[in-house]
Amino acid sequence: MIRPHLAATVKGFPVYVHTIEHADGLVLVDTGMIDSTPELDENWEPVPMPENVPRDVLCVINTHLHFDHCGGNRLFPGVPIHVQARELADARTEPDEHTVNSWVDFDGAAYVEHDGEAEVLPGVRLLPTPGHTRGHQAVLVDTPEGLVVLGGDVAYSFRELGTGATEGQRRVLALAAPTWLAHAERPKVPMPR
C-alpha cells in the first residue's frame, strides 16, 4: 500500500512524501522539509514529519536532493538512502538554489548510489527521469492493482507531465500507469497532450 503524507507547503502549494508498505518493511520516498534555515525563502513552510510516518524505516528513496524532498533525511542516520549517483554528485559539486548542503551531507548519511535503473526491493524499482534535475528518479511500485509511479518532481502538475517536454516526463508517460506527483494529493494516469 502507498500512502501520501504532507511534508511542506510554499504559498499554500503542498509537497507530499510517500510511504510504501512492503513485505520486507516500510520504505519512505522523499522526506520533506522538517524545519527551515536562513538559506530558504520565507515562503516555504516546513511541516514536522507526520506522526504516522514511523521512524523505523527499512530505507529511504530520494527522487532528488532538493531541500523539500531531502530535508528530513537526517532523521534517519544509518538508514540506506537510495539516490542516483548523478544526483548526489551534482548536489555536492554543483548545488543550486534548492540545495541545502548540510541537509544532503549530514552525520550518519548512508547513501546507496545507483547509476540508472535498479531494483531496491522486489517490486520497488528506480527509473531515471532527468529533467527537473539531471539525476532525478521516479520510483516504480508493483501493487496488487498493477504498476504505480511515484514521480517526485518529474512535473509539478499532470498538465505539465502531459506535455512530455523532458526525457523524464516521456519515460513516465510511456508507462501509462497511475502516477503520484510530489505536489498532488491523489494519483492520476497521465495523458499525453
Model-found features: residue ranges?
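Residues that act as N-cap/strand-start positions at coil-to-secondary-structure junctions
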Residues: G12-P14, V112-H114, T133-G135
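Metallo-beta-lactamase
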Residues: I34-L40, V47-D68, L75, V83-P128, R134-R193
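Short hydrophobic/aromatic-enriched beta-strand-loop microsegments
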Residues: P80-A85, L150-G152
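Structural motif
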Residues: G25-V27, C59, G146-L150
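Zn-dependent metallo-beta-lactamase
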Residues: M1-P46, A174-A177, P187-R193
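Metal-dependent catalytic neighborhoods of phosphoester/phosphodiester hydrolases
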Residues: G71-P77
